[in-house]
A protein has these predicted regions:
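A conserved mid-domain beta-alpha-beta active-site/ligand-binding segment of alpha/beta enzyme cores
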Residues: 1-26
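Short Cys/His-rich metal-coordination motifs, predominantly Zn2+-binding knuckles/fingers
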Residues: 9, 62, 114
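Ferredoxin-type iron-sulfur electron-transfer modules in oxidoreductases and energy-metabolism complexes
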Residues: 26-57, 71-172
Length: 172
């Protein structure tokens, strides 16, 4: 049995492989991640905020998503640092929001949408939507999609002091 995200994968044949067995391509079944994102993007701002808060209220900060994610590979995660202390040990909506937003930004341009985070979550958070939305914005803004070419760095993994966008220099 295939995972749900495999049934709606936009790349059912891997773009990178050593050897591949030719099989009939999978037919997309059910809502794709893009369709789920579009449904939520169509919501009003207050509906989106309500949806996001509902998702954050589910989180128990067990970090199963982090442990399951092949792209979470920092030697020391910011949540495990005691000085400075980024998050309290209490499970609050505010700290859950900080945790999830920070994780989403860390995965921007790296997530390959394998779904390991959503499968690992004991509370059923729609983590694939939240990270998938960031991936969609990354592709739209930077023209970058993770996992398609070997040796390329993600859009947020590089720094160029000659970047034409002056936001980081404080100029306009």
């Amino acid at each position: 049995e295939l995972y749900e995200n495999c049934m709606s994968c936009k790349y059912p044949s891997p773009p990178i492989f050593d050897y591949i067995v030719q099989v009939e391509p999978l037919k997309v079944q059910g809502d794709t991640l893009g369709e789920r994102i579009e449904k939520i993007e169509a919501m009003s701002e207050s509906e989106k905020l309500s949806y996001f808060k509902e998702q954050m209220n589910k989180c128990i900060r067990c970090y199963a998503c982090r442990q399951a994610c092949p792209m979470c590979y920092c030697e020391t995660c910011f949540v495990d640092i005691n000085s400075p202390k980024w998050l309290s040990k209490e499970v609050t909506n505010e700290d859950n929001t900080i945790w999830n937003i920070t994780r989403i930004y860390h995965l921007a341009g790296r997530c390959v949408e394998c779904g390991a985070c959503s499968r690992a979550c004991p509370e059923g958070l729609d983590l694939m939507y939240l990270i998938g939305k960031m991936n969609r914005d990354t592709k739209r803004l930077f023209g970058f999609e993770a996992g398609l070419k070997i040796g390329t760095k993600g859009n947020l993994e590089t720094f160029n002091p000659n970047d034409p966008d002056f936001f980081w220099k404080g100029e306009s």
